[in-house]
Regions:
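Acidic interaction surfaces
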Residues: 1-105
Length: 105
């Protein structure tokens, strides 16, 4: 529970959205309407440590795969993403973060 609250607090300054900031579907928790393009890579790394990845999963997979390669896209290793890698994708992925950790039992 503490990691979830910490992740939501990290995302709060980037939230520009409406009434329902979260959504759960098929064992995945989404936090939507967060401006990922304004995030520093250190924020993305911290969220990665807490179990969150940028984008909308399958919807952004091809974009990430095209920019960073299939190995990175499959690994979801956002704890160790570099500045250069983040700069390649941050303007082309959905304004959301998702987690398998908090979306399933």
């Amino acid at each position: 529970m503490e990691d979830l609250i910490k992740a939501l607090q990290i995302l709060l300054p980037y939230y520009y959205g409406g009434r329902w900031p979260t959504h759960c579907e098929h064992d995945i928790m989404y936090v939507c309407e967060v401006d990922v393009s304004k995030m520093d890579v250190s924020v993305v790394r911290e969220l990665g440590k807490l179990g969150f990845m940028p984008g909308l999963g399958d919807e952004d997979y091809d974009t990430i795969k095209g920019a960073l390669g299939e190995d990175f896209a499959m690994s979801g290793d956002y704890e160790n993403i570099t500045d250069e890698q983040w700069d390649k994708i941050k303007n082309d992925i959905s304004n959301a973060f998702f987690s398998y950790r908090f979306g399933s039992n």
